[in-house]
Amino acid sequence: MTSTDTAARLPRAPLPWGRWLAWAALGAMLAITLGPLWLVVKTALEHPQALLAHAASLLPAEPTLLNFRRVLGGVSAEASMAVGGSGAEVNFARALGNSLLFTTLVVLLQTGNSAMAAYAFARLQFPGKRVLFAAVLGSMMLPGVVLFIPNFILIKQLGWLNSMAGMVAPFALISGFSIFFLRQFFLSLPRDLEEAALLDGATPWCIFRRVVLPLSVTPLATVAMLSGIAAWNEFFWPFIVAPGEDSQVLPVALQHFKSQTPQGQPDWTGLMAAATLTLLPTLALLAVLGRRVVESVQYSGGK
């Protein structure tokens, strides 16, 4: 009998109770997290006339893509009501385009401005540096709703209501978390490369653009993803500053769709179909940049 056969016959040690409890807790958290998401998808796939009859079912009784066709404009309001819909309508394509433009502008401007400010706080010396950085940190402690009224007054005086500029402006210049996060990364970079570039006659802007930024892809991707998800889901500010149909983003369009009740109640299957479509760009962004975020967290933990 070989040692391999002996090892194969030895019984495996049972998992400790702590491990079982940890797995049970993870399973419960996973169910709490994914349960509502599955109900959204299940309702989106349910036939409008079968929703109330099979509300307690975990699987759609009559799976169909009809609700997605209705949301995307492939079915008229009359035909929608004929199959059990409420007749509510939404210009999903226009709202999707507005959301994509709004999110792209916020990500580019916020990430770029935050990176430049973070590098200035990390490497440059100028009067009032500590006071300004303390103000940036203090901005993270203020609830966003506190700034809505002054921002709205400013946007109104500039004539930017119902415009993309009015929606983007409050998010474009500063993000306290992004500046703090990137500053901490820039401080961890060795100065040798920057000093070598400085000896070669490079300006601070050239060093930042050609030396620092290529080394900062992972934290920049993290900031871009977090700011992109926040901008994609932003509702309150676009709702108060740009409620017009031509400038509505997806969260505002979904609220408008829900508030339409030609048949006396919201169109839940259509609303869930629209919500499912709204989730897809966020999931795509997570699939593309998720690995970068994990690398950034691992790097921060290692430091």
Residue ranges and their predicted role:
Residues 1-15:
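Short, Lys/Arg-rich, polar N-terminal cytosolic tail immediately upstream
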Residues 19-303:
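A structural signal for multi-pass alpha-helical bundles of membrane permease subunits
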